[in-house]
Amino acid sequence: MKRPAIVSALICLLLLTACSEPDKPSIALYLAVQRGDLDQLERHLHWGTDINAILPYGQYPLQTAAQNGRIIMVRNLVKHGAEIDRTTTAGDTALDLAILAGRTQVADVLLAAGATLDASALLLKAAANGVTDRDTVRFLIDHGADLEHRNDNGDTPLLVAIRQDNHRLATQLVGQGADVNVRAADGDSALGLATRLNAPELVSLLKRQGARPTSD
């Protein structure tokens, strides 16, 4: 091959490479993740932005993407080395945030990538957060959540739901087999607690399911 031909070939190759290289990102990574801007995320990934650096509001990019249900973003971040089990300043992992937000499809992606799940502890946290999403509850139970697991105060998820007068969650938990005769740390029954807290809907629910008062 003659020299001019070689030079021309090299120039063409350089031009093709330049054309295939994405522009540098024009917005911060945290904005790209918040907005679900895949183009900007790809730019950050190409130009070497640290995807395991904490964002201004205490989360990491993977956690924000997971919480917002950005499946493609989550896959891309994991593929490029995002630390799956890193926790926020509040102690939540990307998987925790996805499940608590009802993003069960994202949760499946994270589990497949090796994320760690403590389903029993997270069900208690979901109850404490006032979660009512049926998919969230079902997902945690399907992944081994113990309905009778207790928090530091001695409450099961059902007792937490009763304390919050969360009828929807209590209904779901009872429907999944939660013990309606469970007792709190002070010996009060679920029915006794609901009665004392003046929660008539919960009292009715528990009685229909055969709950007994404390004195029994």
Regions found by a protein language model. Name each.
Residues I27, L31-H80:
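Post-signal-peptide N-terminal segment of Sec-exported extracytoplasmic proteins
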Residues L16-A18:
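C-terminal motif of bacterial Sec signal peptides marking the signal peptidase cleavage site
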Residues G36, G69, G102, V131-T132, ...:
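Ankyrin-repeat intra-repeat helix-capping/turn positions
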Residues Q40, I72-M73, Q105-V106, D135-T136, ...:
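Conserved ankyrin/ankyrin-like repeat signature
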Residues M1-S8:
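Bacterial N-terminal signal peptides that target proteins for export
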Residues D23-L31, I54-Y60, T87-T93, L117-A127, ...:
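Ankyrin-repeat boundary/"N-cap" motif
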Residues E42-D50, R75-E83, D108-T116, R138-D146, ...:
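Ankyrin repeat domain, specifically the short helix-to-loop turn at the C-terminus of the second helix
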